[in-house]
Amino acid sequence: MSHERPPRNDIPRNLSFIAALTERAYYRSQRPSLEEESEEEPGEGGTRPGARSRAHVPGRGRRARSAPAGGGGARTARSRSPDTRKRVRFPDALGLELAVVRRFRPGEPPRVPRHVQVQLQRDALRHFAPCPPRTRGLQDARIALEPALEPGFAARLQAQRICLERADAGPLGVAGSARVLDLAYEKRVSVRWSADGWRSLRESPASYAGPAPAPPRADRFAFRLPAPPVGGALLFALRYRVTGREFWDNNGGRDYALLGPEHPGGAGAAEPQGWIHFI
């Protein structure tokens, strides 16, 4: 019994080959963008260009990989290693000038951008201490105060129970006096003052200086204060305590103010801690 020879193109296929074809068909259906790798079919005289591509054997083929999760065609940033060489480009290599020359004329000031001026001013101010704020009451300050010579002084004294009589700022300090109504034998008079616009304050007692001319019936108290600060003013108010009550004279809420010298060594200047005490 003769067996017919199978046709030349009818090549028996094993299970591994069929499984590889099935796998490639599955990946091609899921990701059509993946390109098949063509393999040249060898012939008798060598390779034939344009031959039909054949599927790879799983052991020799290249398995498809999933596309990046960030989206198709997205390139991930390449990290540089410490050994990566960096390139430096100078402006002249790009057709630019290496230096910019600017000419300034004495009669034409340079044009500095606004943001540069602000930065320069900010840097310059950091080297200086903050300026002290303008002392309160400086615009109303005087070298000498004499309320007793003003009209209506007796009426004010009768209403307030205490009034400033006079105050003078000298090179050794402030000398002043006050009048208080004689409401009782025991009475206490003091002066509350500040040299920094009431950010801090002190209180100095006044001493009895004898009876004051009538009317009305009153007593006189004298006080001493330090000299006003240079370029500032000394603010003060009078306090009167008698029979458990308290009365104030603060110049109608504006405080009394004595002006200090404009420059060190000027009129009215004194040592910072210069005090004059008397009994």
From Swiss-Prot:
InterPro entries: CBM21_dom, CBM21_dom_sf, PP1_regulatory_subunit_3
Chain positions of motif PP1-binding motif: 87-90
Tissue and organ distribution: Expressed in liver and heart, with low levels in skeletal muscle.
Modified residue annotations for Phosphoserine: 16, 33, 66
Region of interest: Substrate-binding motif: 248-256
Ranges of residues in domain CBM21: 154-259
Domain of life per record: Eukaryota
A GO molecular-function annotation: protein phosphatase 1 binding
Disulphide bonds in the chain: none
Keywords for the protein's UniProt record, in alphabetical order: Carbohydrate metabolism, Glycogen metabolism, Phosphoprotein
Region (Disordered): 28-89
Region listing for Glycogen-binding motif, in residue ranges: 176-198
Pfam short name (any one): CBM_21
Gene Ontology CC terms: glycogen granule; protein phosphatase type 1 complex
Biological process according to GO: glycogen metabolic process; positive regulation of glycogen biosynthetic process; regulation of glycogen biosynthetic process; regulation of glycogen catabolic process
Bias-annotated ranges (Basic residues): 51-65
Domain notes from UniProt: The CBM21 domain is known to be involved in the localization to glycogen and is characteristic of some regulatory subunit of phosphatase complexes.
Free-text function comment from the UniProt entry: Acts as a glycogen-targeting subunit for PP1. PP1 is involved in glycogen metabolism and contributes to the activation of glycogen synthase leading to an increase in glycogen synthesis.
Name of the protein in its database record: Protein phosphatase 1 regulatory subunit 3E
Source organism (scientific name): Rattus norvegicus
